[in-house]
Amino acid sequence: SLTAGHCGFRDLREGPHKFTGPTGGKLLGAAPLRQIMVQEELKEVRVFAPATVANVACGYDVLGFAIESPGDEVVARHSLEPGLRIVQISGDDGKLPTEVSENTAGVAAQDLLRHLGMLDRGVELEIHKKMPFGSGLGSSAASAVAGAYAVNKLIGEPLTKKQLLPFAMAGESSADGAWHADNVGPCLLGGIVFIRSNQELDIAQLPGPENLWAAVVHPDIEILTKVAREILPREVPLENVTQQVGNLGGLLCGLIQEDYELISRSIHDVIAEPRRQKLIPEFYRAKRDAMAAGALGFSISGAGPSVFALCEGEETARRVGAEVSRVFSEAPIENQVYVSRINPHGVHVVD
């Protein structure tokens, strides 16, 4: 929800931006703040940041896409008390800290305010978690993106979405120490995002076929990201690297050319999936039945336990989602199914 009028629009040059790595929010190539015309500040803003599927099989740490739901909501409003405060968190069963420096949304928002020289600005945040923790759906990234985006909107939108990337990255990194944009990028920008360099935050949005759908299933089991990363090999045979690079290139070409057959031939992970699948009960059966139901490809979302299938058309995606859900239910493992187009918008303001 936007509460207030508006005046002039931003006059911010939208040329290519380069970012440093984990710098605490430095921007390179951005227009100086004195050159930026911002919209009038708002009294309150509510934003929604969507779940994301990272890695997309063959794009480990360099490829991700956004889905329509679930996601997190953050409300930002002005306060007479100086500084940033988190005044409410819901949907977390008391797990998340309200201390700004220990909360992903708080870190992202604070890093942004520090960059803008506004640390004394009074801002309150409400965080409403509406997606499962440790799901492999980018929960930490969604909160970080929502925190940075909401505060940027509240103070008149001095920065573009792409310029918010390092601040959201700092927020997510505060949760697990990792620095990879395959969740934050698509959550912030929407669509399918390819990361050429995580250190430089050199990213590109990719087009995709209009009728490309995702079926995402989250089984109610817990996989610690730390465990999922430690299980991966430190060294990879050259033959596997060649296969993976070929699959990634094929997937990117298939998306750009809207070639569903090439997409299907390319959604194969020969590095992470063979090791991580053992952490997900019934993974093999779920993949087999998803492919039999018409999926283009099937793999693990992020570090898991969520799994995803890319499909041509909504009908196929719903059929695949139902089949995968059945496999987990028979285990028996409670699960949730999310069937969605690729979300082209990313984080956005909601009523």
Role assignments for model-derived ranges:
Residues 119-202:
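Gly/Ser-rich oxyanion-binding loop with an adjacent helix/lid
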Residues 37-135, 153, 157-159, 189-190, ...:
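ATP-binding N-lobe of GHMP and related small-molecule kinases
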Residues 255-351:
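Glycine-rich, charge-dense phosphate/pyrophosphate-binding loop(s)
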Residues 216-278:
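Active-site rim beta-loop-alpha module in soluble metabolic enzymes
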